[in-house]
Amino acid sequence: MRQHVNPLSRFFQLPRPLPSPEEMFAQSSRPLHLDIGCARGGFLLGLAPLQPEWNHVGVEIRHPLVLSAERDRQELKLDNLRFLFCNVNVSLEEWLDALPRDQLQWVSIQFPDPWFKRRHQKRRVLQPSLLIALATALQPGRELFIQSDVLSVIEPMVMLIEQSNCFKRPGDDFHPWQRTNPMPVPTERERYVLDQGLQVYRRLYQRNDQQAPELSNLEALWQQVDNPSEEEHSDC
């Protein structure tokens, strides 16, 4: 069972300086993949050896998981992978702003913590300010991939992304949910869900050429995002 932390607690509201690609990687000019909410890092530990031409960064708010993932990375001697501890909605925007143009080419948000209730909206990982920061860092054609096994978790993410008008779905994707994972390695949660015969809801987006919206405008739209079945879920 996943252990939640409250990202709005005082401890997690303290900004953390994050190392630049030059500080993390010997070959820092490689294209960058950012995995938001990487948990114990099993997905990236499997992916990084298959994509040595990429640098991979996993960010996670649960510090013990980051320490565990970093130990595994060091044992495997993966020099194109790093794990960072932070609250992405506090510390990531400045890091994204400092990246060289078009270095960030792929972003994944997979099976985020299920803050169901609307009053917990600000605890959800994909906030308007983070989406704008990602949209600003991603050049046209670069990709954002999201997936979850909980429909009421991924639907608000989809609504926020599409309300931003910064992303489009690939032209050959006509299904409500993408049927296959575009990545060659599943997450631990994905394997578990599929082994149970349950559905995974996926969306792949490409950055379009529209300018990122003003934060206040997107926040106003975000307040309209609601989960009508929220009362069916207990507090987390």
Swiss-Prot record:
PROSITE patterns (alphabetical): SAM_MT_TRMB (PS51625)
GO MF term set: tRNA (guanine(46)-N7)-methyltransferase activity
Record's protein name: tRNA (guanine-N(7)-)-methyltransferase
Where does the signal sequence lie? none
Q: Which reaction equation describes what this protein catalyses?
A: guanosine(46) in tRNA + S-adenosyl-L-methionine = N(7)-methylguanosine(46) in tRNA + S-adenosyl-L-homocysteine
Kindly give the InterPro entries that the UniProt entry links to this protein.
SAM-dependent_MTases_sf, tRNA_(Gua-N-7)_MeTrfase_Trmb, tRNA_methyltr_TrmB_bact
Q: What sort of enzyme, by top EC class, is this?
A: transferase
Q: Where are the transmembrane segments?
A: none
Origin species: Prochlorococcus marinus (strain MIT 9303)
| Entry EC no(s) | 2.1.1.33
What the protein does comes down to: Catalyzes the formation of N(7)-methylguanine at position 46 (m7G46) in tRNA.
Q: Which family does it belong to?
A: Belongs to the class I-like SAM-binding methyltransferase superfamily. TrmB family.
- Pathway annotation from the record: tRNA modification; N(7)-methylguanine-tRNA biosynthesis
Q: Where does S-adenosyl-L-methionine bind?
A: 35, 60, 87, 113
- Which residues bind substrate per the record? 117, 149
